[in-house]
């Protein structure tokens, strides 16, 4: 009996390319003075990866990105890497991306023709990411919950709303365009 591969060569290539895109865009960040959490494009790239790959493969891609960062490659915000970055104040948001992929990916894959459900899934996934990251930030910096929310969530809401809009508008188009190559 012949076993089939978990991922086809094409899927592995797409996962590799998506991981590379995440590693290239992930370090680009804008520090803001009121917070240890910078503005990044990482969550947008992750959302587009869900559309392009589907959420199982996007989760694999995310784990590749996190593993490379933990191994010390400078793929996290500000061209940083290492286990210390994951264990630091912003590590909860990096780990929280797992929830983003699982929740948003479920909605995007389950309701492929509904941008409303996709947006709902992305909002729920971002909320879970914010929740985990904020609790982590609270513990790491010995902050109250309102303090952590004011530096770890509030400054990012408008930008993340734009990223959600951009992902829900461009994601399906990318998905359709790249489907012909899969």
Features from the language model and the residues they span:
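Structural signal for the C-terminal ends of transmembrane alpha-helices
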Residues: 52-53, 103-111, 174-178
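Hydrophobic transmembrane alpha-helices
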Residues: 1-59
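Interfacial helix-loop-helix junctions of multi-pass membrane proteins
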Residues: 73-79, 136-150
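Generic alpha-helical transmembrane segments of integral inner-membrane proteins
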Residues: 12, 16, 20, 24, ...
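Alpha-helical transmembrane segments and their cytosolic interface
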Residues: 1-17, 151-182
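Interfacial aromatic-anchored transmembrane helix boundaries in multi-pass membrane proteins
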Residues: 26-38, 66-100
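Short helix-perturbing small/polar motifs within transmembrane alpha-helices
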Residues: 2, 13-17, 24, 83-128
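Membrane-helix interface segments
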Residues: 8-11, 55-60, 111-117, 144-145
